[in-house]
């Protein structure tokens, strides 16, 4: 029992980060260990180059977009709390996440809505709150590469935007994006199991 509080002291603001992200103490300690391993020069923060060392991101077609999500507003570094906040979007939804939700508190970072918002931002390259045909095409190019012809990609982008675009403005808003994915199990598809 005493070891739990001594481990918490290793992570500055550990209890606050745990409450905000929903990670267990054990998961938070593992993430802190991973953060320190990525921070090879012991700077206390990570750069884009540090995150590019993560193999799963290096082979992910959206890896660069995911890495960018760690650096909001053009910042050049991410500290441990920021690192964990981004990763919290990928934390699987547990039964206790929905059972104990206080309506006065902010929605958990791993809620369906927050997972969808995170995914939406990966597509909304210019951050204007809409996914245009051009943005959809850019993301599709990243995801399929040369396996599909340019004409096929353009057709897929056109069809995807047309199917989701309910107001006819030629782009997909967050509300439209959410509606188009209502039948998808986003909670599980956007989850990475982190050992407890």
Swiss-Prot record:
CDD domains: EFh (cd00051). Its main location: nucleus. GO terms for molecular function: calcium ion binding. Expressed in malignantly transformed cells but not detected in normal tissues. The modification Phosphoserine is found at residue 27. A motif (Nuclear export signal) lies at residues 137-148. A lipid is attached at residue 2 (N-myristoyl glycine). GO terms for biological process: cellular response to calcium ion; positive regulation of calcineurin-NFAT signaling cascade; positive regulation of cell population proliferation; positive regulation of phosphatase activity; positive regulation of protein import into nucleus; positive regulation of transcription by RNA polymerase II; protein transport. GO terms for cellular component: cytoplasm; cytosol; nucleolus; nucleoplasm; nucleus; plasma membrane. InterPro entries: Calcineurin_B_homologous, EF-hand-dom_pair, EF_Hand_1_Ca_BS, EF_hand_dom. Keywords: Calcium, Cell membrane, Cytoplasm, Lipoprotein, Membrane, Metal-binding, Myristate, Nucleus, Phosphoprotein, Protein transport, Repeat, Transport. SUPFAM superfamilies: EF-hand (SSF47473). It is found in: Nucleus; Cytoplasm; Cell membrane. Functions as an integral cofactor in cell pH regulation by controlling plasma membrane-type Na(+)/H(+) exchange activity. Binds to and activates SLC9A1/NHE1 in a serum-independent manner, thus increasing pH and protecting cells from serum deprivation-induced death. Also plays a role in the regulation of cell proliferation and tumor growth by increasing the phosphatase activity of PPP3CA in a calcium-dependent manner. Activator of the calcineurin/NFAT signaling pathway. Involved in the cytoplasmic translocation of the transcription factor NFATC3 to the nucleus. PANTHER family: EG:114D9.1 PROTEIN-RELATED (PTHR46002). This is Calcineurin B homologous protein 2. The gene is CHP2.
